[in-house]
Design a protein with these regions (language model features):
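Assembly/oligomerization scaffold segments
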Residues: 1-92, 184, 250
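Acidic, small/polar-enriched beta strand-loop surface segments
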Residues: 1-8, 48, 157-159, 166-294
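A structural detector for beta-sheet-dominated domains
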Residues: 7-9, 25, 38-40, 60-62, ...
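Amphipathic, non-transmembrane alpha-helical segments in extracytoplasmic/periplasmic proteins
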Residues: 37, 97-120, 135-159, 202, ...
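Extended Gly/Ser/Thr-rich low-complexity repeat segments
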Residues: 46-59, 93-103, 179, 263-271
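Short beta-strand and beta-hairpin "edge-sheet" elements
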Residues: 60-85, 269-294, 299
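Short beta-strand-centered interaction patches in the first periplasmic/extracellular domains
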Residues: 80, 87-88, 122-193
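Glycine- and charge-enriched low-complexity intrinsically disordered segments
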Residues: 98-102, 300-306
Length: 306
């Protein structure tokens, strides 16, 4: 751990503290990036430093970087402290209600980012306009995740930025590296593609549309939001079909190295002599960097192609 750093409130404290378990989870969808770290505390230093919820913390080990995280809990135990932090400040996880008329997706993203002092980036996401949008007693992150899911997109929160990306755009990106699955590698995979949906019908009770990707049963979703047009319903049906099918085929690999150059939301070229059907591109849906043991655990899915 020669290049390892723990940056707390802008200061590298690693030379002054001992670190036990430390891992960061990055996710391309479904949850916010998180950090869990155990500090040895035989001299009771943490209590003197008065750690507080909302403090900023980050860990680094070469190219592997958690990005800025916000402390959610500090749990003292015998001779140690366990700190849990998330990539979004607590305010972004608090429930709120609001409505908009004639608003673009980019405006929703920018407003939420500004409210929490964060930046905002989009990749391949079309800036659709909505006639009416309502956020009803839900957190800003849950609200944005839902709206982006309708549009076949996802949300990553990393290092003080909201990153919205199109699923199709992500799958079209070149591989950032290669992973090999050879005999002896610790892996497991599951293929539920036979139970995937072939299409999706979306309705708000008044406006409906169906989008089909091929053979298979049809998913029916009744959404609480007002759908502005048949075209919008078709887009949402496609987006919800993506969300329902994107983990139908998945693999988990455990490695003896950190995989420092890999991140959730990237594409890798999988060479799988032990599971040849997986040869080719795969999407990193989640990755856990274990900074203490210098290992990684990678969750992969296969590109959907729509």
């Amino acid at each position: 751990m020669g290049s390892f750093k723990v940056i707390y409130q802008g200061v590298d404290i690693y030379p002054k503290v001992s670190v036990g378990h430390c891992w960061a989870d990055g996710r391309a969808w479904g949850a916010t990036d998180s950090l869990t770290i155990d500090f040895g505390d035989t001299r009771n230093l943490w209590d003197r430093w008065h750690p507080e919820v909302g403090d900023e913390i980050a860990v680094e080990d070469g190219a592997a970087r958690s990005g800025t995280m916000y402390v959610s809990s500090v749990v003292p135990q015998s001779s140690r402290f366990t700190v849990t932090a998330y990539a979004a400040p607590q305010s972004a996880r608090e429930r709120r209600s609001k409505s908009w008329e004639r608003v673009h997706l980019s405006q929703l993203l920018a407003e939420v980012a500004d409210r929490h002092g964060m930046g905002c980036e989009t990749y391949g996401v079309e800036d659709h306009e909505y006639q009416y949008v309502e956020q009803d007693n839900e957190s800003d992150l849950a609200f944005l995740d839902r709206r982006l899911t309708y549009e076949g997109a996802g949300l990553i929160v990393y290092d003080g930025r909201l990153v919205a990306y199109s699923g199709e755009w992500l799958e079209a990106q070149g591989a950032t590296g290669e992973l090999s699955v050879t005999p002896g590698v610790d892996y497991e995979f599951r293929d539920d593609s036979a139970r995937s949906y072939g299409g999706c019908t979306v309705t708000d009770g008044t406006t409906s549309a169906t989008w089909s990707a091929g053979e298979g049963k049809t998913l029916v979703r009744v959404v609480p939001e007002r759908i502005g047009s048949v075209g919008e319903a078709e887009r949402w049906a496609k987006g919800l079909l993506r969300a329902a099918n994107r983990e139908a085929t998945r693999m988990v690999i455990r490695t003896d190295s950190m995989l420092r150059g890999y991140a959730a939301g990237s594409v890798v070229d999988l060479s799988a002599s032990a599971a040849a059907s997986w040869d080719g591109p795969a999407v990193v849906s989640r990755i856990r960097h274990d900074y203490y043991d210098s290992k990684a655990k990678v969750w992969l899915t296969r590109p959907l192609g729509y």
